[in-house]
Amino acid sequence: MSRVIWIVIDSVGIGALPDAEKFGDSKDVSTLGNIFKEYPDIQIPNMRNLGIGNIDGIDFFESIKEPIGCFGKCKEMSQGKDTTTGHWEMTGIIVDKPFKTFEHGFSKEIIEEFEKKTGRKVVGNKPASGTVIIDEYGEHQIKTGDVIVYTSADSVFQIAANEEVIPLEELYNMCKIAREIMMGDNAVARVIARPFIGKKKGEFVRTSNRRDYSLDPFEPTVLDNIKESGLDVLAVGKIEDIFNGKGITDAIHTKSNMDGVDETLNYMKQDNKGLIYSNLVDFDSKYGHRRDPEGYKKALEEFDSRLPEIMANMREDDILIINADHGNDPTYKGTDHTREYIPVMIYGNKIKKGFNLGVKDTFADIGATVADILNVKLPKHGSSFKGDLF
């Protein structure tokens, strides 16, 4: 039977959605498009061969005559532009009410409860860039042991701790405490551990030991349907965290995009059946939020250079799906995600070549198609386009 290798290139949007301005974004945001404008020499030949430049509305790449895959783009139906919302929608959940955000920081009651249960004082408690806030409070934390708490435009409760001051296990335990607190009326989509190292301002750097503590999905996803059918759901990167482990049969966390590709390949080489579901987060975390278009461009080129290896390790019936989960235009103001169309590229030995899938009304169509390919129950939301692929 077919096996699906599903890779999320985190935040690689391809242009503003019609409602982008309602989410605080300009109609000119385009993660990939604006990177191309700054770096027209970007080399992503393998994604171009898959048809990324042939997607409707993409005018910054020349289209190619004979793409080797199917290609298209999806709108987001959910009310959000974050990781949780994007991944949940692509697996069949429409988030019709935005997750709660805390634009002025967390209430006195929340912070006092957190301090009481963790035994540590809080500093920060405001929306901030993660790299900026560790510079602001990193030295203070070394002196006092106080924990840095902050949020963003997303629905997140983030805890930053120097690994040399607060051990990782304590940081992770504090996140579990925060997850218990941030429920009900105060429910945030994710509590995030943000460990870093360094001795003084200007030298603090995040480590790769991040962990996300998500809400449980509101209803069954495609992942649950695949697992319940007795197939594998193998999660690479932060996929396990995004779904709080629901619908996952095995998982591995990763240190970088290239580590994510390596672990995806490791799973591909094993005797399994079902779904390998990978998230490559560096595009978003290292380059999108930090507004680093040059770094983003290099990361895209690095991923693109690994695609031949991924394709070479596919079995006869394997199907490769590559898509994003939202945008994060590194040329745009601020540090937050951007609400964009996402690209979809699909490849396999038995898949049509050069077929334009057009524009899909929801990310959930991707998950419905994955379910259909694997002959399992379709999710509540989304329409399969499997019939267009063969």
From Swiss-Prot:
One record GO biological process: 5-phosphoribose 1-diphosphate biosynthetic process
Catalysed reactions, semicolon-separated: 2-deoxy-alpha-D-ribose 1-phosphate = 2-deoxy-D-ribose 5-phosphate; alpha-D-ribose 1-phosphate = D-ribose 5-phosphate
Protein name from the UniProt record: Phosphopentomutase
Requisite cofactors: Mn(2+)
Pathway assignment: Carbohydrate degradation; 2-deoxy-D-ribose 1-phosphate degradation; D-glyceraldehyde 3-phosphate and acetaldehyde from 2-deoxy-alpha-D-ribose 1-phosphate: step 1/2
CDD domains according to UniProt: PPM
One family name in Pfam for this protein: Metalloenzyme
Family affiliation: Belongs to the phosphopentomutase family.
Xref: NCBIfam families: deoB, PRK05362.1
One GO cellular component, as annotated: cytosol
Record's function text: Isomerase that catalyzes the conversion of deoxy-ribose 1-phosphate (dRib-1-P) and ribose 1-phosphate (Rib-1-P) to deoxy-ribose 5-phosphate (dRib-5-P) and ribose 5-phosphate (Rib-5-P), respectively.
Keywords: Cytoplasm, Isomerase, Manganese, Metal-binding
Catalytic class of the enzyme: isomerase
Localization per Swiss-Prot or TrEMBL: Cytoplasm
Binding residues for Mn(2+) 2: D284, H289, H337
Enzyme Commission code: 5.4.2.7
